[in-house]
Amino acid sequence: MLPVYIPLQFIDKTSNNFEMPITWQIPTIILLTLIFHKKVVFTAFSIYIILGLFISPVFHQGGSIGYLLTPNFGYLLGIYPLIIIIDNLNIKNKINIGNFLIHGCLAIFAMHLTGIVFNFIQIIYYNQFNLFLYNLGKYSVGKIGYHFLTLFPLLLLIKPIERFKRIK
């Protein structure tokens, strides 16, 4: 996992970085969806999932068909609604800062909701209700704020993407 560091100016210079417990996967998918059509991103992400499940351990905690049984897989499935919601900006051709923030927040929320539903189905199937709140905190509540924060660096790319779309 490539950590995300935000430099902060503290009095103590030995700890001037704040590490975010997420990867650049979500912002990258959002950026690719803004640039390309959703069919291209769907295909690329589907190939990524197939590679991770059957060929090579490309996921965060490895790979293989056993990854289907982890709560993380639900959040990977949540990328599909994220792509659909972000692609609405391409369809409407209204890529601006306000629309991007609204659609970005909705997309991240939809991704987390998909992961929570997948997790809940697993909890019911395995009859392990005591793990639901733990998984909810670990995979959603603990990370959703950081995912929202990663929308702000992407704001710097909105104007160039908008110009690029007009040229095409």
Regions found by a protein language model. Give the residues of each.
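Alpha-helical transmembrane segments and their cytosolic interface
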Residues: 1, 131-168
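Hydrophobic transmembrane alpha-helices
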Residues: 1-42
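Short helix-perturbing small/polar motifs within transmembrane alpha-helices
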Residues: 1-4, 58, 62-119, 155-163, ...
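Membrane-interface helix termini and inter-helical loops of multi-pass transporters
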Residues: 4-16, 57-67, 124-134
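Short aromatic-rich membrane-water interface segments that cap or initiate transmembrane helices
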Residues: 15-24, 67-74, 134-143
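Alpha-helical transmembrane segments of multi-pass membrane proteins
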Residues: 26, 30, 75-83, 148-151
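Membrane-helix interface segments
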Residues: 38-43, 95-98, 132
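Small-polar-interrupted transmembrane alpha-helices in polytopic inner-membrane proteins
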Residues: 41-56
